[in-house]
Amino acid sequence: LGFLFDEGSQQDMTEQSVFIQQGIWARLGLPRELSWGFIGVFLFITGATIEQSWLASMLQSRGFAEVEISLMLSVFGLCVAAVSWFSGIGAGVLGLRRLMWIATLCYFVGSVPFIFVALPMNNYPMMIVSYALRGVAYPLFAYSFLVWINQRCEARILGRAVSWFWIAFGVGMTIVGPWFSGWMLSHVGESNTLLSGFLFVALGAFCALILNRDEPVWARNQKISQAMGEGIMVLVREPKMRLAVVVKTINDIGKFSLVILMPVYLPRFGFSIAEWLTIWGLVNVVNIFANYLFGWLGDKIGWRMTVVWFSGTLCGLASLAVCYAPVMFGHSPAALFIALTLYAVGLGAFGPLSALIPSLLPENKGAAISCLNLGSGLSNFAGPFIVTLCVAPLGVEGTLWVIALLYFAASLLTVPLKLPDNGTKE
């Protein structure tokens, strides 16, 4: 398999060639040269996160307390954050293809003990370790491909290109995964549903790493200590990068909190887990269109302004709507759907961050992308951690208020994230 790890010519990031963006698909932000990569990300994410919408309710039914569940997911999130950060700087050490192959290996190495030993024995310490190892697979795989996109697509379509990435990511994690697992759970049970993820992951790796013949151009001449030191120093030297990490962390806290809170909160109002999974999948169909809409809008009016005006504002209002829709309307799937749809639209408005943040440091995109990915990964930790801290003293309602306030803050924190003078998408 040595040929699969060849990264092509060893050029510096600033000297790389980008695609000549021609044809209707390229103008839509989906260059055909990367099409198999997008398909691979969708399949890999579907398999690697197939349990995320129902794992909390499954563990609760096995007698685990809410605090134990959220702690396990917080540990998982910390590992995801660390690996997400490394996926940006690791390209200069190992190369993008090699990182994605390592991610595939981690998935299988972590999944086997989690499914066959930890879950059947209800072994909590082993569950934490094996689930964390399984969990690092999807950010390492997906965010390495996000680096690939940022490297190979020119600025005028970058907002749309990264929106396609988040569409592939979101369709796998929040639409196909929940719908497919909802059907599988009722027919073959939890363990076999988890095992079905193996097929999706294998197919995803095949599409993104074998059928995808594009060669990322990235210098692999750094030592790991040098690359990690550079990634840390960017956060020390650049205040904008620190702000960007905070905003990107807030981006997905609702998504990773809601999948813990809603399976516990909604049954009080007569909702079943199957209803929750169906509604959650449906509203994320809306997110597909919102992702592309705001990617296009960001390319037109500016990435920063799109995030400032629409992202945190809509997500904050939606968090409050999700809290009070069941209180006001009871067991009303329509009311819950409308509230969650507002959240899905707001989430799409965060999409231009994936074009904005790397462009804040055009001379060091690798380190900037590592900051972007760190924020993405920290969402996995921050969402469950907020639940751990807040749900006992404040309840579900108070926790949703905390999430709403953080979203409102994210819009304000984006205001200073102005591009350098040579930036084109302010």
Where are these regions (language model features)?
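Cytoplasmic helix-loop-helix junction between adjacent transmembrane helices
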Residues: 130-168
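Juxtamembrane intracellular "pre-TM" segments in multi-pass secondary transporters
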Residues: 15-31, 213-245
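Helix-loop boundary and gating motifs at the non-cytosolic
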Residues: 28-77, 242-247, 251-269
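Helix-to-loop junctions at the C-terminal end of transmembrane segments
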Residues: 84-96, 185, 291-303, 391
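Cytoplasmic membrane-interface "Motif A"-like loop-to-helix N-cap segments
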Residues: 93-104, 300-313
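A late C-terminal transmembrane helix in Major Facilitator Superfamily
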Residues: 364-393
